[in-house]
């Protein structure tokens, strides 16, 4: 069994915030793969489904970001899971918008949701880092992550979320390479190698050679004798 955790803050006020991209990722997976309706459990919203024989539970903690670990810890204890069974989807300031990376273990890099999870289950869980870009200065980070995605960002955000939905079965199976391939097919589809069709260059106009001059008629060779010519004259 796998526990997919999406990080965010509860309520319509935060629904489209950059900080809530983890919630958005789980909503996409649930919609794409026919998971059960969301219901309240483990201090959050939970939905259940399967990818083949692998059971997957989706969890969106409703404890607010800074206490996300409380909800994750409850679910882990209930299902008797290990940290390696947990995959957390979260916003990542240090990745360009639309980029996605998978990482296991390591620090929380100042992310309050990850810091809380570290405190409850340790660092040895898998993370799906979803790039939202950086505002440029640390003093602007809080306002930036708690602001809605701009309309101009809708296209790459939709591509990223669809790619996550496409690759979710591979992620549950432990094949992060194929998961990343599925995401890339949405966010950076390969360009056609055919290119624009070639057009034949018009043939250069060529002058037709002038017709060969007909050889001039030459008088027949005179073979008659003078006497014969005289006879022919009086005929």
From Swiss-Prot:
GO biological process, one term: protein quality control for misfolded or incompletely synthesized proteins
Coiled-coil segments: none
Record's catalysed reaction(s): an N-acyl-L-alpha-aminoacyl-tRNA + H2O = an N-acyl-L-amino acid + a tRNA + H(+)
Alphabetized UniProt keyword annotations: Cytoplasm, Hydrolase, RNA-binding, tRNA-binding
Source organism superkingdom: Bacteria
Primary role: Hydrolyzes ribosome-free peptidyl-tRNAs (with 1 or more amino acids incorporated), which drop off the ribosome during protein synthesis, or as a result of ribosome stalling. Catalyzes the release of premature peptidyl moieties from peptidyl-tRNA molecules trapped in stalled 50S ribosomal subunits, and thus maintains levels of free tRNAs and 50S ribosomes.
PANTHER family assigned to the protein according to its UniProt record, in alphabetical order: PEPTIDYL-TRNA HYDROLASE (PTHR17224:SF1)
Name this polypeptide is given: Peptidyl-tRNA hydrolase
Originating gene: pth
